[in-house]
Amino acid sequence: MTDIAIVDYGMGNLRSVAKALEHVAPEAVIAVTNNPEVVRKAERVVVPGQGAMPDCLRELDRLGLREAVRDAAANKPFLGICIGLQMLFDSSEEGNVSGLGIVPGRVKRFPASAMKDEKGQKLKVPHMGWNQVHQSVGHSLWKNIANDSRFYFVHSYYVEPADADSAGHSAYPFSFTCAVAKDNIFAVQFHPEKSHAAGLTLLGNFVRWKPV
């Protein structure tokens, strides 16, 4: 049996995620896969993703992975990264598409009118680079990670949960949710595989996580 399945739907640098997981869990059986049955049988599932959410959802459907991802999000330790966070939500302003509807809320674009720093200078979209993450709640995946640690971001859209599912916030320039926690799901807007020690710690915590 595969210990960790990394869902491969052709949208993201999956090798960097796999390499980071191999580093923190050298004895684990890790599969980068587009096979729905491998995803269903894995003990843990990671859904990364980069690019446009409509394209990601279309590829999930083309490969027959949508229901396997939904089943994983309902039944086993599940980590979403970047678009893997956004697609969990009900809908997105990006292409006005419906998401998987697993986490109540929506995905919104950074509004051009609000993208100014405290000096009035224009901020670029996408939000790209290192930023602090404030831990909104205590969670097993934050273990041994200092509050307000810096993680690496690349995104033009952010999530807005409808319920109290937020587990972390960042600011660009306003506060936005960058991590959600719901039952056996933990999902982040930033890229832990690119976030050096803090990111590796989070991935190691995921490998050991036993949701109640």
Swiss-Prot record:
Subcellular localization, as worded in the UniProt entry: Cytoplasm
CDD domains: GATase1_IGP_Synthase
Listed EC numbers: 4.3.2.10, 3.5.1.2
PROSITE patterns registered for this protein in UniProt: GATASE_TYPE_1
Record function comment: IGPS catalyzes the conversion of PRFAR and glutamine to IGP, AICAR and glutamate. The HisH subunit catalyzes the hydrolysis of glutamine to glutamate and ammonia as part of the synthesis of IGP and AICAR. The resulting ammonia molecule is channeled to the active site of HisF.
Record's subunit section: Heterodimer of HisH and HisF.
Designated name of the protein: Imidazole glycerol phosphate synthase subunit HisH
Protein species of origin: Nitrosospira multiformis (strain ATCC 25196 / NCIMB 11849 / C 71)
Name of the gene this protein is made from: hisH
